[in-house]
Amino acid sequence: MYRHDQRTVMTLDAGGTNFVFSAIRGNQDIVETICLPAVSDNLNGCLTVLKKGFSAVKRQLENEPVAISFAFPGPADYKNGVIGDLPNFPVFRGGVALGAFLEEEFGIPVYINNDGNLFAYGEALAGILPSINEELKAVGNPKRYKNLLGITLGTGFGAGVVIDNCLLTGDNGCGGDVWICLLYTSPSPRD
């Protein structure tokens, strides 16, 4: 699908422990990965790590990047690039316009999405799902799969759901996540 796209995009997988920076072109990594410790309790420290990581990636590039795209835990206002109220990142409590900050810093568009969603969508469009469907086709089996549940395990626990090749995002960007479950320790007044 994107194998022939020659645009360069800087990437980040933002985990609770590490920030992993890279760049892709034609659906392939094109630079050495840069792994920096995540800073979750100091906003200036976190922003400095983000600038440092993307700047280090940019120095490795032969061509100017056209965008920054990265995966961040949720929930968040991904569409507007605002990260806030994450259990593993108290530094973002109340909301931080991370997308706008990075757009101003690097002068290119910034796209942020949920890490579980991006994992699942990538596997559905260009990963395991097309591979399975190709294997089925090769042996003459007419069955094809278009649905996928992707689970991510790291510092946190995330998930993404793809149904009929469409990503289920929900109202907070975490439609497939099971990031929080309510535990009632006392009976409900209705019981």
For the regions a protein language model found, what residue spans apply to each?
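Glycine-rich phosphate-binding loop and adjoining helix at the ATP-binding site
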Residues: 39, 43-44, 67-68, 76-147
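Gly/Thr-rich phosphate-binding beta-strand-loop-beta motif of the actin/hexokinase/Hsp70
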Residues: 2-27, 152-163
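Residue-level structural signal for beta-strand termini and adjacent loop
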Residues: 35-36, 89, 173-174
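N-terminal phosphate-binding loop and adjacent alpha-helix
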Residues: 30-64, 82
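Conserved small/polar residues in nucleotide/adenosyl-binding loops
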Residues: 184-191
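Hydrophobic "anchor" residues
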Residues: 18, 29-30, 83, 167-168
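Hydrophobic alpha-helical segments and helix pairs
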Residues: 141-171
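A short, polar/charged loop-to-alpha-helix boundary motif
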Residues: 174-183
